[in-house]
Design a protein with these regions (language model features):
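Glycosyltransferase catalytic domains, chiefly GT-A lineage
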Residues: 1-303
Length: 303
């Protein structure tokens, strides 16, 4: 039988989000056959005790690639590296599904799809592009007629010191958000990703390095990839969902209003300088499926 696990990472500051992610998974009966593994990047002993009965393995995250010493005090940055080495930490599984701890599972179908997507050693991942999504590209007009265009991929590539030819190859490729992905243990994608991660870390820039490396792996090295629908990794900072009051679930705001699979609070939802990820009391104005004005949190709630 194929052994599957969902893996995440957290420090002590994001522990409430970690608990919410775990609860959002375990509320589904289908999760009984799937393990949950946690990489510890600074959890307290009390926090570890609180989740131990709900998860299957907890391992201390390491610096799997050497980085400048002055970065090593920031334990949460280990998430930028360790997710590329999951089979090393948790070797007893055939399929891995990574979910950032600032994301949570809204509907189960997406979980099955991620595990299906990585079959035949493919990478299962979602592109950060879709109807209504905020653009990640910026244009500076020079002398009124020439355009200097900067995309998220190109910016990160140049900041990491990549060759211009490689930066241009990924400049206009739809950005891949590495907050949710699936891979089989024996996939060659791990080795290619790790190779690219070493390149992106060469100048000492850690934040964003793993995402840039996976974009290189797909768009430069042509790793076999299964692209999943945008609702499988819904970036709330790009576009708010709508809420279906009848079915008590979040949906895409555009017709046909597909149910959100994974809600991802990447980059945060900020109000008066406070991030919803650190204060669950923060609420935002969204629409109901029927068009009513609602004030809601986008964090997981079991109510």
């Amino acid at each position: 039988m194929t052994k599957k696990t969902i893996v995440t990472l957290s420090d002590s500051n994001y522990f409430p989000l970690l608990e919410e992610l775990i609860h959002s998974i375990r509320r589904f009966k289908q999760s009984e056959n799937i393990d949950i593994c946690v990489l510890d990047a600074g959890l307290s002993s009390d926090q570890i005790d609180l989740i131990s009965a709900q998860v299957d393995e907890i391992k201390k995250a390491d610096w799997d690639i050497n980085i400048p010493f002055y970065k090593k005090g920031k334990e949460w940055l280990k998430s930028q590296i360790s997710r590329a080495f999951l089979p090393k930490y948790f070797p007893n599984y055939d399929k891995y599904l990574w979910i950032d701890c600032d994301a949570w599972v809204n509907s189960w179908e997406c979980i099955e799809n991620y595990f299906k997507a990585c079959e035949n050693n493919k990478l299962g991942i979602t592109q950060s592009i879709g109807p209504g999504y905020r653009s990640l590209a910026k244009v500076n007009w020079i002398f009124g007629k020439f355009a200097a265009i900067k995309t998220q991929n190109y910016k990160h590539a140049k900041m990491s010191g990549l060759l211009e030819k490689d930066a241009r190859k990924i400049a206009f490729a739809p950005h891949l958000n590495i907050g949710v992905f699936s891979l089989m243990k024996q996939s060659s994608c791990w080795n290619v990703w790790q190779k690219n991660l070493k390149k992106t870390l060469a100048k000492g820039r850690v934040f964003g390095s793993e995402g840039l490396a996976i974009n290189m792996t797909v768009y430069i090295d042509n790793a076999e990839t299964e692209f999943l629908p945008i609702n499988h990794n819904w970036i709330t900072s790009h576009l708010f969902p709508v809420y279906d009051e009848n079915d008590k679930t979040f949906r895409e705001p555009n017709i046909p209003n597909n149910e959100i699979g994974i809600m991802h609070l990447a980059a945060g939802i900020w109000k008066n300088g406070v991030d919803m990820r650190v204060d669950k009391n923060i609420k935002v104005n969204i629409k109901s499926l029927e068009g009513k004005n609602l004030v809601k949190s986008l964090r997981y709630s079991n109510n």
